[in-house]
Amino acid sequence: MQPNREQAMELLTEFTKSDSLIKHGLAVEAAMRAYARKYDEDEERWGVVGLIHDFDYEQNPTWDKHVYAGVEILRQRGWPEDIIHGVAAHASYMNINPKNQMEKTICAVDELTGFITAVALVRPSKNVLDVAASSVRKKMKDKAFARAVNRGDITQGAEELGVDLNEHIDFVIKAMQGIAGELGLDGSAA
């Protein structure tokens, strides 16, 4: 089975009803696709991993079940091991060392997309087009802001990719800007 975006979206929406979790999957997908283009990798595969990485979270929101349940579902449905491993690698508590660029990238963009979303939503415009890397860095210093986001994962992710943190943040912002409307971050909610 070589899953495509349509199959990945079907899986995501089968298990996920929360609009914010679906948008998170879309944001991670956009960042993964952008990095796949940058690294001349398989954009479809990387995008699929980004889109489904949290597909089981709504039904399994605890660290002892999330990802483990998802991996089992993917195996039962015959999904390829590289995609399964990519999904599993994003959860640092599973103690899976990212073994390739795709796995390093999912780890690097997962928390960051959520943080960028939070930064956009507190802006008066609620528009990701108005978010700059400098404003994200400033908010990262405020531990009370989006406290559930692991800032260590964000900085470690950039290091694992061998990318300057500001460049990484800017790159992911640009990827998200490309689908701002789908993410509800185009200012229409302001």
Residue ranges with predicted function:
Residues 1-62:
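Acidic/His-rich, divalent-metal-binding segments that scaffold phosphate/diphosphate chemistry
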Residues 3, 7, 23-27, 65, ...:
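Conserved active-site and cofactor/substrate-binding residues in soluble primary-metabolism enzymes
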Residues 9, 13, 29, 33, ...:
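Predominant activation on well-ordered alpha-helical scaffold segments within soluble catalytic domains
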Residues 11-12, 21, 26, 51, ...:
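Generic detector of leucine side chains in alpha-helical contexts
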Residues 16, 116, 127-128, 133-189:
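C-terminal binding/interaction regions
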Residues 39-143, 155:
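Divalent metal-dependent catalytic cores for phosphoryl transfer on phosphate-bearing substrates
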